[in-house]
Regions:
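Charged, low-complexity intrinsically disordered terminal segments
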Residues: 1-385
């Protein structure tokens, strides 16, 4: 509504066909009885990223970022993040949002205080931009990859790079994963990444942020893209577990995290056809912190699935490729899906869901930043951050 009013004030204030919109009042609406048995109560707050240019307010509001920072800093057990982008750096002059810094501080605190603490991050395997990696038309795609890797694992301003200075094994606390699927198309085995477009964070199975905001400056700083989210604080609780101990989890946050993990691990009823007659995996999802789930289930399944896809399709991005020359050599070899499709399908039937590892070492030795002579190199870096 504020966007419409801004447009109306600037562009069409004298056109009577576009009247001011007034907020509706819903005080008199009765919730149908059937819905009352299907829903839970919760405290919900609307969050925004807006400023003068987007909503004609006299200040910059970054309540979305502030909610992220507060929930991360005050988390006790577990953070689950799914997002389309992850561009956030520590002590950077080019990226200003502080999500990465607060994540790093929270993991450091867990290390110093000997806490069992987990962070799950799910991102698309590749950004949703035109072109192919290593091709002339793929500069925009590579630019986003460049900033993603600088944020996660490469260089002194990255999350994992900072953690390695103090924490012997940062991956004890973090799992960065993605999603991939396969099918038979026109009699041929094919694969494609599942593009994660979700923007949510679930903290301690009690707090949830859902909305339109990506993890980057464009969405978080308030003075750029306008965004809206909600933060949900559960007020109804159910018995669950954290690190093997009894725990009161929020009904909504727990059910959302469980459903997302069920989907990624192939546990939903509609995913049974993928199993080739095997029973659906029976995995206890209540405790996301305990070692047996974090390492032996989530991490092990992601690793096994990644290995199968690499063997069957020679997919990329992959940690097996650290330079553009290695990428060409990797792609030049015939995949199992072509020289032995029957064996390949047998291998694919051993997959568990769609979870795969995010390849943090992909093109590690290559420069993914756009060339200065390219159109991507001529625009401000803020376009990609």
């Amino acid at each position: 509504m504020t966007e419409f009013r801004r447009f109306q004030t600037e562009k069409s204030k004298d056109i009577k066909d576009y009247p001011f919109l007034l907020p509706k009042c819903y005080d008199t609406i009765k919730v149908p009885r059937v819905l009352s048995t299907m829903s839970e109560t919760a405290d919900v707050q609307v969050l925004r990223s807006v400023s003068n240019w987007s909503s004609l307010i006299n200040h910059t509001e970054d309540s979305i970022q502030q909610a992220y920072l507060s929930l991360i800093a005050n988390s006790r057990h577990c953070i689950y993040i799914e997002n389309q982008f992850f561009v956030s750096m520590i002590n950077s002059n080019e990226v200003n949002n502080e999500i990465c810094r607060v994540l790093c501080d929270r993991i450091k605190r867990a290390y110093y205080e000997n806490e069992v603490f987990r962070v799950y991050i799910l991102l698309p395997l590749l950004p949703g931009f035109e072109g192919d990696v290593g091709a002339p038309g793929g500069s925009a795609l590579q630019a986003v990859l460049h900033w993603t890797f600088l944020s996660l694992s490469r260089g002194p301003n990255s999350l994992i790079g900072n953690l390695k200075k103090l924490v012997p094994d940062p991956m004890k606390y973090i799992k960065v994963c993605s999603l991939r699927t396969w099918d038979i198309l026109c009699g041929k085995l094919v694969t494609e990444l599942i593009y994660i477009h979700c923007k949510c964070m679930i903290v301690d199975d009690k707090y949830t942020i859902i909305g339109s905001a990506n993890i980057n400056d464009r969405s978080q700083c308030g003075n750029r893209d306008s965004e809206v989210c909600i933060v949900v604080k559960d007020t109804e609780f159910v018995a669950s577990k954290m690190n093997g101990r009894p725990y009161q989890a929020g009904k909504f946050a727990l059910s959302l995290r469980r459903h997302l993990m069920q989907e990624h691990l192939g546990m939903l009823p509609e995913q049974a056809a993928r199993l080739g007659g095997r029973p659906a995996p029976n995995i206890d999802l209540d405790d996301p912190v305990i070692d047996s789930f974090f390492f032996d289930t989530w991490g092990a399944i992601a690793k096994k699935n990644t290995q199968i896809y690499e063997e069957v399709f020679r997919v990329y991005p992959t940690d097996m490729v650290e330079s553009f020359d290695e990428l060409k050599a990797w792609q030049s070899q015939m995949p199992m899906s072509e020289y032995s499709p029957q064996l390949a399908e047998e291998q694919l039937r051993q997959l568990t869901g769609s979870l795969v590892e995010f390849p943090l070492n992909f093109l590690l030795k290559a420069n993914l930043a756009p060339g200065l002579a390219s159109k991507e190199g001529l625009v401000p870096t803020s376009v990609f951050t």
